[in-house]
């Protein structure tokens, strides 16, 4: 029987240093080594979310990490989720259910923090009773000392869990010595003792050239460097936030089916398109440029955390008109979740669920009307699209109800296995659905691409589930080969 290991927390010198991906790698490594790990992030801020099997909502990163660990995702893995709805306000999701909107000042003030702290601590305790080890993830930088008293996710959480903290730094952005040294030295003496190692991430070039740097860092900080993880391009793990979109190509190309995802200001769940990106028949790009939209074969309207605000902006910047013009010229238009709502005749928000805009006309491509509601629908679904016999899978996360225009006979796109219906189908080039993950299903992708078969040559069908498992294994191998794993196990066994 495997010896129980201490929890481990991957803390960061800043945001986007690679904590989430390294956490996924360690989840897979521990699984490979015979443990039963589970991920945990007390508080996550992200627009990318996922529905658990119980129909509750967590951050997508923890769902990915759970998949890497080979365990079902659960709200205890991410008890507190903040979903930004504007520059200053976020929807607060506690234990998988929304409890209201908060601006930054309201959220970070001390009043009410202890209740939230008790909730995230209880979630950790429940998780730790079922799994070992717990692979914890911090948020942003551990050096925001002005927020120390109200922090729920970094060093106070590590102290509660009695976790060994590993500091992750991104050498690719420069200043790695200052960021590591500063992060360590800004901690209290007690917290400083808890930091047991450093991982240098995203290294480019010959690692041997940094050997002297490792010794300097260890001498400066008094903490061992556990590994230098090289930058990679050939491993594909779902990203947590839309920062990765900055590195994706934004224009059409020759010789492929060009699929344009409309780049909304409040775009959410962009992981809906990861499977399409891996299809060798497809070139997928993100844009809000009207000329680039005109070059697409298929336009996808994605999910949005603020649908009415995005609709207002699409009308203001000319993208709405460009989508309608492209559709008249034979381009396929499909909407998912918020994008489905955008395609209807009208969107109403009588109670101000999203904000100050109470009503706007939609694009008018689908004979449906959406009314925003305070209660959120969150669930996993099995479904069949149109008359297709294959069972497909996906999940819903939305706060609106979409109904046919009175007097209109609407054809649903999907029939759910529980007897319900979803979406609206006009023809093969005009449709919408609430189901995230619909484009992870090969049968639906083939149907979507079918009108453009003349552009295609022979291709290999991608089994996306197998592909993702292969990527987790590749990631684990990459991290394992550059990490002092025996020392990490020694630390987590309490023998450091």
Curated annotation (Swiss-Prot):
Pathway(s) where this gene product acts: Cofactor biosynthesis; adenosylcobalamin biosynthesis
InterPro entries in the record: Class_I_gatase-like, CobQ/CobB/MinD/ParA_Nub-bd_dom, CobQ_GATase1, CobQ_N, CobQ_synth, GATase_3, P-loop_NTPase
Active site per the UniProt annotation: 337, 436
Single Gene Ontology MF annotation: catalytic activity
UniProt GO BP: cobalamin biosynthetic process
A Pfam family hit: GATase_3
Disulfide bonds: none
SUPFAM superfamilies, alphabetized: Class I glutamine amidotransferase-like, P-loop containing nucleoside triphosphate hydrolases
Membrane-spanning segments: none
Keyword Repeat: no
The protein's role, per its UniProt record: Catalyzes amidations at positions B, D, E, and G on adenosylcobyrinic A,C-diamide. NH(2) groups are provided by glutamine, and one molecule of ATP is hydrogenolyzed for each amidation.
Similarity section: Belongs to the CobB/CobQ family. CobQ subfamily.
Matching PANTHER family: COBYRIC ACID SYNTHASE (PTHR21343:SF1), DETHIOBIOTIN SYNTHETASE (PTHR21343)
HAMAP family found in the cross-reference section: CobQ
Protein name per Swiss-Prot or TrEMBL: Cobyric acid synthase
Organism: Phocaeicola vulgatus (strain ATCC 8482 / DSM 1447 / JCM 5826 / CCUG 4940 / NBRC 14291 / NCTC 11154)
């Amino acid at each position: 029987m495997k010896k129980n290991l201490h929890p481990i927390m991957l803390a960061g010198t800043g945001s986007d240093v690679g904590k989430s991906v390294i956490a996924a790698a360690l989840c897979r490594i521990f699984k490979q080594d015979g443990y039963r790990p589970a991920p945990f992030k007390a508080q996550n801020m992200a627009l990318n979310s996922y529905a658990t099997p119980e129909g509750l909502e967590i951050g997508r990163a923890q769902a990915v990490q759970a998949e890497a660990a080979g365990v079902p995702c659960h709200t205890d893995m991410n008890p507190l989720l903040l979903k930004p709805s504007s520059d200053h306000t976020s929807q607060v999701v506690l234990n998988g259910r929304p409890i209201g909107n908060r601006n930054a000042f309201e959220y970070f003030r001390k009043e009410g923090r202890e209740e939230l702290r008790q909730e995230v601590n209880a979630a950790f305790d429940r998780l730790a009773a079922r799994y070992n080890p717990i692979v914890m993830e911090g948020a942003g930088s551990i050096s925001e000392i002005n927020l120390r008293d109200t922090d729920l996710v970094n060093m106070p959480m590590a102290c509660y869990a009695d976790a060994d903290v590993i500091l992750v730094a991104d050498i690719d952005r420069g200043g790695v010595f200052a960021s590591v040294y500063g992060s360590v030295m800004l901690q209290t003496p007690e917290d400083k003792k808890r930091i047991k190692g450093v991982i240098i991430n995203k290294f480019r070039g010959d690692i041997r050239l940094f050997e002297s740097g490792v010794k300097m860092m260890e001498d400066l900080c008094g903490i061992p460097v556990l590994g230098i993880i090289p930058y990679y391009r050939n491993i594909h793990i779902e990203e947590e936030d839309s920062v990765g979109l900055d590195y994706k190509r934004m224009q059409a190309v020759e010789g492929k089916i060009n699929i344009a995802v409309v780049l909304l200001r409040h775009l959410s769940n962009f992981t809906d398109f990861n499977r399409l990106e891996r299809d060798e028949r497809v070139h997928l790009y993100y844009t809000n440029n009207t000329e680039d939209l005109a070059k697409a074969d298929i336009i996808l309207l994605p999910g949005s955390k603020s649908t009415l605000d995005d609709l207002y902006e699409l009308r203001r910047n000319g993208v709405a008109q460009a989508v309608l013009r492209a559709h008249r010229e034979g381009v396929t238009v499909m909407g998912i979740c918020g994008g489905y709502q955008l395609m209807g005749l009208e969107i109403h928000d009588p109670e101000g669920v999203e904000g100050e805009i109470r009503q706007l006309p939609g694009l008018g491509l689908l004979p449906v009307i959406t009314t925003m509601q305070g209660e959120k629908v969150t669930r996993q679904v099995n479904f069949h699209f149109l008359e297709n016999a294959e069972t497909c899978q996906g999940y819903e996360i939305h706060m609106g109800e979409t109904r046919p225009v009175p007097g209109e006979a609407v054809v649903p796109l999907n029939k759910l296995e529980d007897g319900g219906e979803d979406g609206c189908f006009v023809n093969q080039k005009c449709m919408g659905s609430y189901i995230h993950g619909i484009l992870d299903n090969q049968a639906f992708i083939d149907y979507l691409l079918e009108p453009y078969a003349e552009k295609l040559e022979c291709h290999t069908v991608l089994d996306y589930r197998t592909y993702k498992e292969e990527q987790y294994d590749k990631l684990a191998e990459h991290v394992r080969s550059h990490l002092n794993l025996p020392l990490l196990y020694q630390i987590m066994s309490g023998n450091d």
